[in-house]
Amino acid sequence: MIKSELVQIVAARNPHLYHRDVENIVNAVLDEITDALAAGNRVELRGFGAFSVKNRPSRSGRNPRTGDTVFVEEKWVPFFKTGKELRERLNPGAGDEDDDDN
């Protein structure tokens, strides 16, 4: 699903709202999440999940074309951890979070 499809679905479920207003709301929510992450804050949507940023330290990498060693600078990357309700909905009837693949 892409953002425009999300806007269409939300607008269809809420016929009392104009499509333009739904689009503005979706954009505002995404902008607030982005701004919070850019400020180094964590955004938690209970039951759905939590957005945060993690630091990837600098390291040596390899250019896949040439095989040359290259320096990869430190960077911050977005990270999403699913909430319990989302995990349960995706995996109905699944046991605890512990992975017992034995």
Swiss-Prot record:
PROSITE patterns: HISTONE_LIKE. Keywords: DNA recombination, DNA-binding, Transcription, Transcription regulation, Translation regulation. One of its GO terms (molecular function) is DNA binding. It comes from the Bacteria. The keyword Protein transport does not apply. The keyword Transcription regulation applies. This protein is one of the two subunits of integration host factor, a specific DNA-binding protein that functions in genetic recombination as well as in transcriptional and translational control. This is Integration host factor subunit beta. The lineage of its organism: Bacteria, Pseudomonadati, Pseudomonadota, Alphaproteobacteria, Hyphomicrobiales.
